[in-house]
A protein has these predicted regions:
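Alpha/beta enzyme core
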Residues: 80-94, 98-110, 119-195
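Aromatic- and acidic-residue-enriched carbohydrate-binding clefts of CAZyme catalytic domains
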Residues: 115
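Short hydrophobic/aromatic-enriched beta-strand-loop microsegments
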Residues: 37-39, 93-96, 219-223
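N-terminal small/glycine-rich loop or linker at the start of catalytic domains
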Residues: 1-13, 45-67, 100, 105-108, ...
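Glycine-rich, positively charged N-terminal anion/phosphate-binding segment
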Residues: 2, 17-92
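Active-site beta-loop-alpha junctions enriched in small/polar residues
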Residues: 17-19, 42-44, 72-74, 99-101, ...
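Alpha/beta catalytic cores of nucleotide-metabolism and tRNA/nucleoside-modifying enzymes
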Residues: 4, 8, 12, 18, ...
Length: 323
C-alpha cells in the first residue's frame, strides 16, 4: 500500500478522531501494528493564528511515523498556509476533512459542507496541493444524500487536482454514526478511482476488516471507534491479512495497555487534564467486560494518577486476572 511517496507497511490505518487520536493513543495503535496513524482534526485557522492548543495537536514522536495530519477549514488561502505549516512540522501526509458533519463545522462551511460546494472544494484542494510537496489525501462521506453522487464527484475533482488517496466513510452527513455504513459506495468508488481508496465504517472486528477488503476491493481499511478501547484490533486485522490465527484476547495485556495509556496521558497532558479526560476513555476499555458498570462508576471522579491506577487494578483483580 502506497500513498504518494509514502509506503505503508500494511493495509491498516487509524482514523482521525476528535478528542481521541492524540499522541499517547496514536503510539498505542502504532505499537499494535497500525501502518498509518492520523491526528485529531486540526483547525487551519488555529494553525495560522498560532493557537498553542491547536499547534500541540501536531506533536509527534519518531516511533509513530508515518504520521498524517488532518486539517479542516473553508478558506483556500488559509488552508494552503496551514498545510505549509503542517509540512514544516515534519508530517508525512496531509489529509483534508470533507466528512465532519458536526453542526459548528458545517455552519462555518467546512467539513461535510464542502461536499455541497464542489467549486469551493476544488479551489481548496488546488491551493493545498500547490502549497506542499508531501502526499495529500482527503476523507469524505457519502454526501448529503445516499446515492453517493456527491462523493463520486468530489473524488473525481480531487484526483484531477493531484490528491494521492481518498478515504471514505459511506454514511451520509445527516446519519452521523446511525444506521449502517453502505459498503457498496466504497466498492463503487474503487471502480471509478485511479488512486488508492481507503474504506472506513462499521469495522467492529478483524473479520469485518477482511470482509471490507474482500467485498469492496479497497486498498486499505481505516479503523476509528472500534480501536478506542481496543487498539490491538490492528494486530488482529494484520494476523487475518497474513492468513495467521487471530491473537486471542489477553486480559493481562489489555490491562497493561490501560495502565500505560493512563500513565502516558498523565506525562503528556499533566495529571489534572489526563484524569478528567481518562474518565471516559477508560470506560471504552471496560466495554464488554464483567463488572464494567461498577468500574465506570468508580472512575467518575478520579483526580489523581494513583487513584486511577488503583481503580484499574481493582477492576482487573475483580476479573481474577493474574498480576
Amino acid at each position: 500500500m502506497q500513498i504518494g511517496s509514502v509506503k505503508l507497511e500494511n493495509q491498516t490505518i487509524l482514523a482521525p478522531l476528535a478528542g481521541i487520536t492524540n499522541l499517547p493513543f496514536r503510539l498505542l495503535a502504532k505499537e499494535a501494528g497500525c501502518a498509518l496513524v492520523c491526528t485529531e482534526m486540526v483547525s487551519a485557522h488555529g494553525l495560522v493564528n498560532k493557537s498553542s492548543k491547536t499547534v500541540r495537536l501536531m506533536d509527534s514522536q519518531p516511533e509513530e511515523k508515518p504520521l498524517s495530519v488532518q486539517i479542516f477549514g473553508s478558506d483556500p488561502a488559509i488552508m494552503a498556509e496551514a498545510a505549509g505549516l503542517v509540512e514544516s512540522s515534519g508530517a508525512d501526509i496531509i489529509d483534508i476533512n470533507f466528512g465532519c458533519s458536526v453542526r459548528k463545522i458545517v455552519k462555518n462551511g467546512a467539513g461535510a459542507a464542502l461536499m455541497r460546494a464542489p467549486k469551493t472544494a476544488e479551489a481548496l484542494i488546488k491551493s493545498v496541493r500547490k502549497a506542499v510537496r508531501i502526499p495529500l489525501t482527503i476523507k469524505l462521506r457519502t454526501g448529503w444524500n445516499p446515492t453517493g453522487d456527491q462523493a463520486f464527484n468530489l473524488s473525481e475533482i480531487a484526483e484531477a487536482c493531484g490528491v494521492d488517496a481518498i478515504a471514505i466513510h459511506p454514511r451520509t452527513a445527516t446519519q452521523a454514526f446511525s444506521g449502517r455504513a453502505d459498503w457498496s459506495i466504497i466498492a463503487a468508488l474503487k471502480k471509478r478511482a485511479h488512486i488508492p481508496v481507503i474504506g472506513n465504517g462499521d469495522i467492529f472486528s478483524a473479520k469485518n476488516a477482511i470482509d471490507m477488503l474482500e467485498q469492496t476491493h479497497c486498498d486499505a481499511v481505516m479503523i476509528g471507534r472500534s480501536a478506542i478501547g481496543n487498539p490491538i484490533i490492528f494486530s488482529q486485522v494484520l494476523a487475518r491479512i497474513r492468513g495467521e490465527e487471530e491473537p486471542e484476547a489477553d486480559l493481562d495485556h489489555h490491562f497493561e495497555i490501560m495502565i500505560r495509556y493512563m500513565q502516558e496521558s498523565v506525562k503528556y497532558f499533566g495529571e489534572e487534564i489526563a484524569c478528567r479526560m481518562m474518565r471516559s476513555r477508560l470506560c471504552w476499555f471496560a466495554k464488554g467486560l464483567r463488572n464494567s458498570s461498577k468500574f465506570r462508576k468508580s472512575i467518575n471522579h478520579i483526580s489523581t494518577q494513583t487513584e486511577a491506577l488503583q481503580r484499574i487494578e481493582a477492576f482487573r483483580d475483580s476479573l481474577q486476572v493474574k498480576k
